[in-house]
Amino acid sequence: PRFYRRLRIPVSVHLPLAKWETRFDPQSTLKQDFHVTPETVVQVPMMKREDEYDYLLDRRLSCRVVGLPYQGNATALFILPSEGRMHKAEAGLDQETLTKWFKKFTKRKLQLYLPKFSIEGSYQLEKILPKLGIRDLFTSHADLGGLTNHSNIQVSEMVHKAVVEVDESGTQAAAATGMVLGFRSARMGAQVVVFNRPFLMAIVNPEGVLFLGKVARPAEGHF
């Protein structure tokens, strides 16, 4: 049998500054409760914008999905599982699901409430990338000629570190306000969608997934 040397690759990614196609008004950002758990509530700066968004309700995964385009060709997907269904949504999030969502999106007028947050974390890509259709990298079929001169190298572990900051303008942090927000009644025809409990976020472009993470506690930036 042929023996392969194992290679551990650290990958650090700080996503470049990206602006929303339509920014949030900072004057509409106010403090609001975020339910980390049914028993734990923290105050977070909550952005608000009423507009038409790409939207769908995935009944199979028990979640709502809202798409916010950046300037250029990238889109942020915010995924809000029904209460108690986070694990179900996480388990079903793969390349096939993302592709299906983009095909099934419809334009819907929403009054969207989304917390500002900054998250940083590390996770094992060898567990995530196969779900997104990338498998050969962790087998003997991978072409690693650009990384090493050895021919008998196989990736056993890839550690990904990502930083994402989301605010009114896009992926850039800003100071929070000290006021308290009360949800206003939406205008006629607008549906209210409030991200006030743990949710998932993906940033995608035509080439693939740039970022995938879970926002569990915006005030403290936890994955």
Regions found by a protein language model. Give the residues of each.
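Secretory/exported precursors with cleavable N-terminal leaders
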Residues: 1-223
